[in-house]
Amino acid sequence: VGLTFDTGALIGLERSRHLMRKVYDVAVSHDVRITVPSVVIAEWWRAGEQEKARAKILRSVVVEPVSELIARLAGVALTLNPRAQTIDALVMASASLRPNEVIYTSDPNDLEMLRDCVPQFNSVRIERA
């Protein structure tokens, strides 16, 4: 099992929300891989007083670049669900390449709609951050 964090999950972790702090602490203590697609960082990262805390979080996760395969899977998802957001499609595509992956998100409904319309995404579990 591995975890993928989207922007909402990172915000929850940064703000020390109980659920995300617990998920993160358990994952780190059990050497569970936490993946953050690189596009999520662009949506989450802001300059300012929290940069050191954000950098510390980033050092503890695997930042995954968007490969051509991920981009194509996301494009298929956007074809099948034109109302979906590009970053959500990229997060789902990224997670779908790892078996037994769980995505933590603040928008489970958006990701569930993508999962339901793209067969390659069916194995991804989605949890509220």
Predicted features and spans:
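Short, well-structured N-terminal submotif of metal-dependent ribonuclease cores
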Residues: V1-V36, W45-V61, E127-A129
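Acidic, PIN/NYN-like endoribonuclease modules and their adjacent C-terminal/linker elements
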Residues: G2, L97-A129
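Alpha-helix capping/helix-boundary segments
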Residues: A9-L10, V40, I70, L90-V91, ...
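Short, flexible loop segments at the rims of nucleotide/cofactor-binding pockets, characterized by
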Residues: L10-E14, I41-E43, T79-R83
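Short beta-strand scaffold positions
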Residues: V36, P65, T86, T105-S106
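Acidic catalytic patch
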Residues: V40, V61-N81
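Acidic, metal-associated active-site segment
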Residues: W44, Q85-V102, D110
